[in-house]
Amino acid sequence: MKNGHTNGNGKSSKKKYTFIDLFAGIGGFHIAFHNVGAECVFASEWDEQARKTYQKNFEKISPEMFASKNFAGDITKIDKNAIPDFDILTGGFPCQPFSQAGFKKGFDDTRGTLFYDIAEIIRIKKPKAFFLENVRHLYAHDNGKTFETIKKVLTEELGYSLYHNIVKASDHGLPQNRPRLFMIGFRNTKIPFKFPEKKPLAFTMSDVFDGAKVNRDVGFTLRVGGKGSKITDRRNWDSYLVNEKVVRITSKEGKKMQGFPDDFNFPVSESQAMKQLGNSVAIYAIQDYAQKIVEALDNNYE
């Protein structure tokens, strides 16, 4: 499965790396890492509608994963020791507050949150690298305590390096800003990691609307809920002037804005498809960073 509008990535690696796809949603991370030559050996997603879309699109790409029943549901109920060995952990996890005790205790502060499950998997499975994605507000969440706790757990307690950056989808070819916090780390802390260079837009909102005249080159960030605001309303994110008429985007356009390939299918309702796209990741940005992770492992393989 390749991107609908290619961004020029997808170089082959010296080694076939394996990865797991946590909080998988509809598989944005799966597409990005598949495109750089990695193989998904385990995925976890609790939402039944998202699971339908994920299975529909990846059953042929990762048949062994589905055949071995390694497409799990609720991450909190997974036997983490039973997860297959893998090289890279990936996941876009929800932003949640930690214990009011602050971040003095580190790992224990994260109990009861979904980050705790990520940290537990890293502790038990000891992957070569991880790639985590979250909303940019995580960095300043709870006066910075949330991020400091995450940093302490990943570096001081689990022993990984940590590189982090606020990344816009529009800096990696896609026509929406969608700023997100990317966190990358390596078990071998001596591995240097260089952020990928920014790229010009691969296409604009005009291309998204099949060449029509559109009032913006870069679109609004896709969201979940809150649809239907007037085009002049600052809360509007789903309406555009297309050939001088107000048009609301559908999953057809949303799919392009997130970098999903043209043959990606939604076996769910249109409202569910839009919700799933709003919850997904910007594939071009993920793929650019995935490529750099693979290159770093290739050049510094343990």
Residue ranges and their predicted role:
Residues 205-302:
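C-terminal target-recognition/interaction regions appended to catalytic cores
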Residues 2-126, 136-140, 145-148, 155:
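Core alpha/beta nucleotide-donor-binding catalytic domains of modification enzymes
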Residues 73, 165-167, 269:
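Conserved beta-strand termini and adjacent loop/short-helix elements that scaffold enzyme active sites
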Residues 41, 162-163, 282:
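A local structural micro-motif
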Residues 78-88, 95-239, 243-247:
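Class I S-adenosyl-L-methionine
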Residues 38, 159-160, 262:
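Short aromatic/hydrophobic-glycine micro-motifs
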